[in-house]
Amino acid sequence: MADEEDPWGFDDGGEEEKAASTQAGTPAPPSKAPSVASDHKADSVVAGTPANEEAAPEEVEEIKAPPPPPEDDGYRKPVQLYRHWVRPKFLQYKYMYNYRTNYYDDVIDYIDKKQTGVAREIPRPQTWAERVLRTRNISGSDIDSYAPAKRDKQLIQTLAASIRTYNYHTKAYINQRYASVL
């Protein structure tokens, strides 16, 4: 891709000019700036010689530039996606099952038939009333019967008795507080 022009490239010259300008004779950057050099005892005096005299021969050696990165041709291996997806049919809660049946069943049926190759009409959106009627249109075997239990009656009486004092005092407080308005 070196001979092709990069449509997304915003630089004028490219990497070749940058590499040529760095190798053409620009000095290598120093390892430490003079203002950053530390004055520790170990750095400043080693066997009676100052640190600046010792560091001078090390800076004479040129630091080699890192090799240029390999040329990127822009090709990325495509991600392999599996075309066949088995839709999970297990639903944990009965409420979620009823909601799915009520709301999404037409669309799911359309997708299932389309995957098997059967032509089917595209489902139209339902009104709220249609969805409610579909939910309540349950066969006799699926009806959950409710038989009032003795425990339910006891809980209702206990709750009513425990909240009675709260209701009384709240009503008394409101009447007293807002007597001038009422």
UniProtKB/Swiss-Prot annotation:
A single MF term (Gene Ontology): structural molecule activity conferring elasticity
UniProtKB keywords: Muscle protein, Phosphoprotein
Tissue and organ distribution: Found only in indirect flight muscles (IFM).
Domain of life: Eukaryota
UniProt keyword Phosphoprotein, yes or no: yes
Coiled coil: none
Post-translational modification comment from the UniProt entry: Several forms of flightin are thought to be produced through post-translational modifications, possibly by phosphorylation.
Keyword Phosphoprotein among UniProt keywords: yes
This protein's GO CC annotations: A band; striated muscle myosin thick filament
GO terms (BP aspect): adult somatic muscle development; oscillatory muscle contraction; sarcomere organization; striated muscle myosin thick filament assembly
Region described as Disordered: 1-76
Disulfide links within the chain: none
Biased composition, class Acidic residues, residue ranges: 1-15
Physiological role: Possibly involved in the regulation of flight muscles contraction, possibly by modulating actin-myosin interaction.
Protein name: Flightin
